Amino acid sequence: MTPRAPAIRLVTFGIGDAWYAAEIAYVERVLRHEGVHPVPNMPPWMEGVLEHQGRIVPVIDLRRRFGLVEDDGRAPTSGGGRLLLLSLGADVVAAAVDRVVDVRAVAEGEIASPPRLVRGVAGEFLKGMVRRDDVMVLVLDIPRLLTPDEHLALDGCVPPPAAAVVAAAGSLDDA
């Protein structure tokens, strides 16, 4: 009996006409795309922040992050949409997508490396590609959605927990 290759569970989602997937290990939850508050002076791909279960979460517009914008620079909208709450190590971000389709298990060997040209254009975000029915799905390398510098920049848009603010205010009184 031949041992089976380990399976990876992927959350499949769409942005425009393209299909993407993220390993389910990084996806905490799928939310409706609502309650996002803009934050001034953020990168164009940073949509804003939302409050979820007592924490402030930065929202990344994946369409803009991947450069999928109209000629006039505006990201096309398809209405509604979903937010994938993603765990990036110590950080949690929400990724705006058009729709979430399903969760599917694929053998690790089914995920093919993208061709060299594709790796050069979008390789920073890609783990590989997998065929789903008759469609090619780009599997994202979720930990690489943000660079270390971008993680630091996002820290500036999310206020510290209230306890840290109170502690800091108390230390100012001591000065």
Language-model region placement:
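An acidic, low-aromatic, low-complexity terminal/linker signal
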Residues: 1-175
